[in-house]
Structures are given as structure tokens and as C-alpha cells.
Amino acid sequence: GLLRGRVERFPDHGADGKRLLVPHIGWNEVRWSQSAAAHPMLAALPERDHYYYVHSYRPLPRDLATVVGVTEYGGDFAAAVAKQNIFAVQFHPEKSQAAGKRLLDAFATWVASCR
């Protein structure tokens, strides 16, 4: 694969023992890395924003330095990863209203700058 790691199904219960609904459907906050070195797109995004999810699995990247966004659902998981010319998210930006548009605008600007 392009990024090393695993993917696992969300457990039935979170770290606090509360039952998790799987699939995870709904809005959750993403905490973006504030390190400029993490990825150039992040400069255009607020430190935190809410995005829409529909998923039953979460990524477990081997290299934690690739994690640029984190969400909490039964515990923290990688919401976004980036490495060189790769930027991937676990949520649906196209369904995430204003936050999704900000992300897609930042992505388009970043891609245009790579020419």
C-alpha cells in the first residue's frame, strides 16, 4: 500500500465502556494538526471543524507522523493522513457542508500549487 498500517472495525464498546453504534453515522469534530510541516493544506483550515461520517472501520496507520487529523469515537482515531503527494480523509467532505467546502477548496489550491 501507499501508507503502511491496518484497518479495523469499530469495537462494540468505546474505551469508556459505552456502547458504540456501528456503522458510525453523523457529525464529528476533526482536530487538525497545527504543525505547518504536517501538510501545506492545513494552513487554510481552522484548528477544529465538524465533518460528516458514514463508516464502520477506522485506519490504524503504522507511522503516526502521517496522521494530520484526529476524531474521537470510542477513542481517538486517524480522521486524515498525509504523506508527500497523498492526502486522504475518513469522512465525506462532499456531505460536510461549509467545512467540506473549505477542505475541498484547500485541496484544489494545494493541487494547483503542485504543478
Residue ranges and their predicted role:
Residues 89-115:
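Acyltransferase
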Residues 71, 83, 90-91:
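Residue-level recognition of conserved beta-strand positions in structured domain cores
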Residues 48, 82-86:
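Beta-strand-turn-beta hairpins that frame and shape the catalytic cleft
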Residues 75-82:
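Short, surface-exposed beta-strand/loop micro-motifs that present aromatic residues
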Residues 1-73:
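Pocket-forming structural segment of enzyme catalytic cores
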Residues 51-52, 87-91:
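Active-site-proximal beta-strand elements of phosphoester/diester hydrolases
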